Every structure is written in C-alpha cells, then in structure tokens.
C-alpha cells in the first residue's frame, strides 16, 4: 500500500497517469529465457486469477476519475500444453470460469467506485486463441454459456443481464502485430467483432517482421533473418498456404529448412517507425490501416505502443532505449 501511494505521488508530480497495464507477462519478462513460459501461470490456475485481480485493484486505485482502464492478458494458455481434445476443452472451461470471476470482480469495482475497467484478452500465435474466429468461438462456446449459469447463480442476474455483464468487462486486446501474423485485414476483424458484440478494450500498436521472397535468390534474406534468432522469446513464423495460415512454432525451424516461400511473417516486435530494414520488411502497413480505420470508427479509446524487444534486436537496429521510445511515439503521433 505504501509503495502504491508513493507511486501515485510520483505520477502526480510528473503529470502522468496510468490507464492501462500489460498483464500478460507474470514476473520478469526481460534478460532471461521466456519462450512458452510467457503463458505461465495460465488461466487454468488460481495464480493467474489472483494476480489479475490484484492488478485490477491497483489500477482502480491509480486510475484518475473520469477515465476508463484496462489490462491485457494471455489467450487462456499455450496451445501445445494441452495435447488432447479433452485437455483443450478442460483448459477452455477452467480459463473461462476464472476470467468470469474477474468480470464479476470488475462489476463490483464499478459499483463501488464508479470506475469502469475491462480485461482485454490478447490472441497470439500458438496461444489457445490465435485469431478472431477462435475468439468468437471462445465467447460462444465457453464464456457466454458458462457465464450465464455462473453469474446467474452468484449475482442473481437473468441470461440477458449476465451476457451484458460479460460483454462489458471481457473484451479483446487487438495486438496489430499478432493479427497481422494471422493474415487478418483490420477492417474485417473489427467488423466481425462488432457484429458479435465483442468490444476492443485496447489496441497494441506493434509491427511484425515481414519476409518477402526475392525472385533472384534468398541468401541475403536468410542471412538477415538469422540475426533475429535469439533465445529469450518465442518467434513463431506464419505463412499463408492455400488460404490457411500455417504456423512454425519458432524461428530456428524456418532457418534450418530454408525452403521456398512467397511471404513469411515472424513474431518479432520490431520498431514501428521502420517499414524496411535491409532485405526484410515489417507489417507497418497494418498499423497504418488500423489508424485510418480508427479515425472514422473509434472502436477503442486505449492505444498502447508495444515494442518490448529493444534488448534483443540485431545490433544494427539497437539505439538508446529512451531515444527509441520517443522516436516511436513521435512517428505514431505524426501519422495519427
């Protein structure tokens, strides 16, 4: 409590405020091997529930009056931890119940403080939710039916009121990098979610690596891509094959085989101000599409620039951390 009060004072003195948090990582997220442990503890555990509720209590204390707040979180769990159909179903059910406990906690916070906070579920490659179709299915098959029963029992609400509560407090975190890896066009995704009544709590402004095949040979491309192979984070690679997205669960798999391709996209958050670096490109075009859409359709009021890989970038892209962050913000403000 004293730390929180101290932090509040510092925020006030520096004329800044907190309206969003990244609740996906748990514990240290830098300078050590993370890989699939980024999902630990997942939503099948009480640890994840307790951690998230505690973060929301802190956000409720920090959030200035008149603002809304949100916390992004993992897409239930890591897909490959649940080997059978039954195990996957159980993980979705348990994860949904724990997220619904958070939704009821947020309902209580709003009743007591007047502050509206939402949990923003963040799909990502190899997560149990990777794309908008899987989000829709999670709501339809798990959150809504389980939630109607659970909220009805605990809060005495009828089915319609329970569904409204779920849609109010459980939203999507639209990470631009992640949805570009799913080869989804922003307009299509936004319209699909809106039609299903699913809100976008937060948009994370981020870019993935885009690798376009060179007709005269890819040696330079493979050499450039190898510089992004580092041991801290998972860097899934996706490819669109016959209309479907194929995922390789880490960069070394692609680098080892070096087979022919037209376009690959890699889960490596690169500086948003770079469209191209040497033989490689970025999905910066997706950021520009999202920004254009937002000007006409304000689907979310929370935007968070989310490049977290500064420590592991190839040396040619590394700059002073503060300067890099300022450059990203300046680029974004200039374009938006």
Question: Residue ranges of each PLM-predicted region?
Answer:
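Aromatic-lined glycan-binding groove of carbohydrate-active enzymes
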Residues: 189-272
């Amino acid at each position: 409590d004293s730390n929180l009060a101290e932090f509040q004072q510092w925020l006030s003195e520096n004329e800044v405020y907190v309206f969003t948090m990244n609740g996906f990582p748990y514990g240290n997220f830098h300078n050590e091997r993370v890989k699939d442990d980024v999902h630990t503890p997942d939503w099948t555990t009480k640890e994840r529930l307790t951690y998230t509720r505690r973060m929301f209590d802190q956000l409720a204390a920090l959030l200035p009056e008149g603002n809304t707040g949100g916390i992004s979180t993992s897409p239930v769990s890591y897909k490959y931890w649940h080997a059978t159909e039954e195990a996957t179903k159980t993980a979705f059910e348990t994860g949904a119940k724990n997220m619904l406990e958070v939704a009821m906690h947020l309902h209580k916070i709003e009743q007591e403080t007047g502050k509206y906070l939402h949990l923003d579920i963040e799909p990502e490659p190899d997560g149990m939710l990777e794309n908008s179709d899987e989000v829709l299915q999670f709501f339809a098959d798990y959150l809504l039916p389980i939630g109607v029963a659970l909220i009805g029992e605990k809060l005495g609400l009828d089915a319609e009121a329970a569904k409204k509560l779920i849609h109010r407090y459980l939203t999507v975190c639209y990470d631009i990098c992640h949805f570009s890896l799913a080869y989804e066009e922003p307009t299509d995704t936004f319209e699909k979610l809106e039609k299903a009544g699913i809100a976008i709590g937060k948009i994370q402004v981020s870019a993935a690596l885009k690798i376009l095949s060179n007709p005269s040979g890819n040696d330079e491309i493979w050499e450039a891509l190898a510089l992004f192979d580092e041991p801290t984070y998972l860097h899934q690679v996706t490819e669109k094959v016959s209309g479907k997205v194929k995922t390789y669960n880490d960069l070394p798999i692609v680098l080892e085989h070096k087979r022919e391709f037209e376009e690959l996209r890699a889960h490596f958050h690169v500086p948003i101000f770079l469209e191209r670096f040497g033989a490689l490109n970025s999905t910066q075009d997706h950021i520009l599409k999202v920004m254009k859409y937002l000007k006409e359709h304000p689907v979310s009021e929370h935007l968070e620039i989310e490049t977290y890989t500064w420590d592991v970038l190839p040396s040619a892209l590394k700059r002073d951390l503060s300067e890099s962050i300022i450059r990203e913000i300046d680029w974004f403000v200039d374009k938006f």
